[in-house]
């Protein structure tokens, strides 16, 4: 068997799932569609005279498709690896795997490769499509080989990162959020190094060579160039691309080695292990009955000596559930008999007959540590308890590090007189906003998938909670747990207004628009968590939708500008956006299709395209109106069925069955 039975099982059953064939077919069709539309844009706006024009087209097309494939591969490899392990933890099946005869390496490596199988199959299926780029000219087979080597090494490293973090963290949100934050931090740090802000050269290597040797994005940029110059300082490695391949393999070996060594130390975590509290054991009912135990219980505030003496009178050691023979001369009350004369005054009700049951307060003394639940228990649990683990603070600290990098870069550019609105300033702020949207969406979808995998959702459905209490409670918990991710980027916007980079009108547009997008991301996560019973499908669909709406549309516009240089040649890409809207409708309306969700699915990509176009044309008010109208309508279209007629257990409407 290949790397143990876990991976062998996935290899055996994966071809039986239609998802394997649908995924690789859609990805290849996407690449072919982009290639065709790019050709239509080129021939519709420019005159192709000779082979040189074809070669330049092939080179530019190859680079853009390579960047797109790397972004998708890195994102989904890390996400699928983390969610696969987190799902095993939520369903308590990882403990069962630990009880088997599987070795640590078979468990860790088998689960890692099983989660990456779909990504690897999709990459292999894309090889013939990229070979077509060589037919245009300007692309060599060495470039294609280097590009795929960098992509596969990045997939292995990012998947190992997600798997290791998921084995370490005990909650799904912690695993997904930490994976995303580490990836962004990895790319951001080496992106800063590539600009020369840290150093120009070190140990004989330029800053660009160091960045290409340690960053997947910088490595793919270097690998897609026609000629890669060798660096004498690297010696036998030769080029920064070879250095990156070595670094990626070393990172994968290191992460998997740590995971193999620590998997049985980390799991099961302390939070999932049952803990027997001493107070609960003390209050355990003895063989003499609850009435006798209530009369023998020490009063509140009693010292440890009084508790020990009380336990001796009952014949049991303090703090244990064991029963021993009573001490000689001790008064023992038989079940149903009268209370002994040694009972303190006030411990029994004088108006109660000897045969009646004791008062409830006498049987269950009030615990001063008891907490009162709010009217909405869902939001109380989200806010007042450690519902997502005590180590969620690490996620917040990691985000604060990234926020400090963005804020520091903006302050440095403002101090040096660099424009904060265009160029690097807007890119840093946009990346921070996108990261915040991804984290808010991840918090929302994992709040539902964790309940479902932990079998707690069934208990909530049989309670007297209304759909509004459940949905609003989850949304309130999402914004509370991600308050740093929501508030801090908005404070940066206020700083830009204070620095004079934004007017008051633009600040209002930005804050209101971002608030609408936050609401959309949170509601999208709740909607996907309700619609999909499989946690990995829910997380992948939810985060993939955010990825498509913002980065996918931006990539289409980048391709359009690369081949035409103007906005007039938009018609071919409108077909691609409509195609994406159809896929979005299938993803969002899989369980609860409606006309509102259908309209929103086709409107969001078009409106995002229109908003970016309006921004480039300095028509900020049109971009604001389009974003607020489209994403606000989509949020309401997902919210209304959830609080009115949506059955979170089955993912379908139940009004027609009543």
Segments from the language model and where they lie:
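Helix-loop-helix units of permease transmembrane domains in multi-pass membrane transporters
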Residues: 7, 84-116, 379-383, 387, ...
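Transmembrane alpha-helical segments and their membrane-interface loop/helix boundaries
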Residues: 1-77, 83, 118, 122, ...
């Amino acid at each position: 068997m290949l790397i143990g039975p876990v991976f062998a099982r996935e290899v055996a059953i994966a071809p039986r799932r239609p998802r394997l064939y649908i995924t690789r077919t859609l990805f290849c069709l996407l690449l072919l569609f982009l290639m065709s539309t790019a050709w239509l844009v080129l021939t519709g706006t420019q005159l192709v005279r000779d082979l040189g024009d074809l070669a330049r087209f092939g080179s530019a097309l190859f680079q853009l498709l390579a960047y797109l494939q790397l972004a998708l591969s890195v994102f989904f490899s890390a996400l699928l690896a983390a969610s696969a392990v987190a799902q095993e933890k939520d369903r308590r099946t990882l403990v069962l795997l630990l009880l088997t005869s599987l070795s640590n390496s078979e468990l860790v490596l088998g689960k890692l490769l099983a989660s990456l199988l779909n990504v690897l199959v999709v990459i292999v299926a894309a090889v013939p499509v990229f070979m077509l780029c060589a037919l245009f000219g300007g692309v060599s087979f060495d470039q294609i080989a280097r590009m795929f080597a960098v992509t596969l090494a990045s997939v292995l490293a990012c998947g190992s990162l997600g798997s290791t973090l998921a084995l370490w963290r005990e909650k799904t949100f912690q695993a997904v959020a930490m994976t995303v934050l580490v990836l962004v931090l990895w790319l951001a740090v080496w992106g800063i190094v590539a600009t020369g802000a840290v150093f120009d050269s070190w140990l004989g290597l330029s800053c660009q060579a160091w960045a290409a040797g340690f960053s997947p994005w910088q490595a793919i940029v270097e690998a897609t160039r026609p000629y890669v110059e060798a660096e004498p300082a690297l010696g036998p490695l030769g080029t920064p691309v070879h250095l990156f391949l070595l670094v990626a393999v070393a990172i994968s070996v290191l992460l998997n080695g740590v995971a193999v060594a620590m998997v049985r130390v980390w799991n099961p975590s302390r939070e999932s292990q049952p803990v027997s509290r001493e107070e609960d054991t003390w209050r355990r009912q003895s063989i003499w009955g609850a009435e006798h135990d209530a009369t023998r219980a020490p009063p509140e505030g009693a010292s440890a000596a009084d508790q020990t003496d009380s336990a001796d009178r009952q014949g049991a050691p303090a703090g244990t559930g064991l029963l021993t023979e009573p001490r000689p001369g001790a008064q023992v009350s038989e079940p149903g008999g009268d209370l002994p004369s040694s009972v303190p005054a006030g411990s029994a009700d004088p108006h109660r007959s000897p045969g009646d049951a004791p008062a409830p307060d006498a049987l269950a003394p009030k615990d001063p540590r008891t907490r009162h639940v709010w009217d909405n228990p869902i939001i109380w649990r989200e806010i007042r308890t450690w519902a997502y683990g005590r180590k969620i603070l690490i996620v917040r600290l990691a985000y604060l590090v990234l926020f400090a990098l963005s804020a520091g870069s903006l302050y440095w550019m403002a101090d040096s007189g660099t424009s904060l609105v265009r160029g690097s300033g807007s890119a840093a702020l946009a990346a921070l906003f996108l990261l915040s949207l991804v984290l808010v969406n991840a918090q929302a979808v994992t709040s539902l998938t964790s309940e479902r995998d932990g079998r707690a959702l069934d208990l909530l459905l049989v309670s007297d909670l209304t759909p509004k209490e459940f949905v609003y409670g989850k949304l309130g918990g999402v914004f509370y747990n991600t308050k740093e991710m929501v508030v801090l980027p908005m404070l940066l916007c206020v700083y830009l207004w204070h620095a004079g980079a934004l007017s008051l009108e633009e600040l209002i547009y930005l804050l209101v628009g971002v608030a609408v997008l936050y609401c959309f991301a949170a509601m999208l996560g709740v909607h996907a968590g309700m619609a999909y019973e499989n946690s990995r499908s829910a997380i992948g669909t939810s985060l993939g939708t955010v990825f498509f709406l913002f980065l996918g549309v931006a990539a289409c516009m980048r391709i359009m500008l690369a081949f035409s240089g103007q906005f007039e040649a938009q018609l071919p890409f409108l077909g691609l956006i409509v195609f994406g809207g159809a896929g979005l409708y299938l993803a969002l309306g899989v369980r609860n299709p409606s006309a509102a969700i259908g309209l929103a699915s086709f409107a969001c990509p078009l409106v995002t395209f229109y908003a970016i176009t309006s921004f480039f044309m300095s028509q900020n008010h049109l971009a604001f109106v389009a974003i607020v109208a489209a994403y606000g309508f989509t949020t309401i279209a997902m919210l209304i069925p959830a609080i009115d007629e949506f059955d979170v257990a089955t993912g379908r409407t139940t009004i027609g069955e009543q």
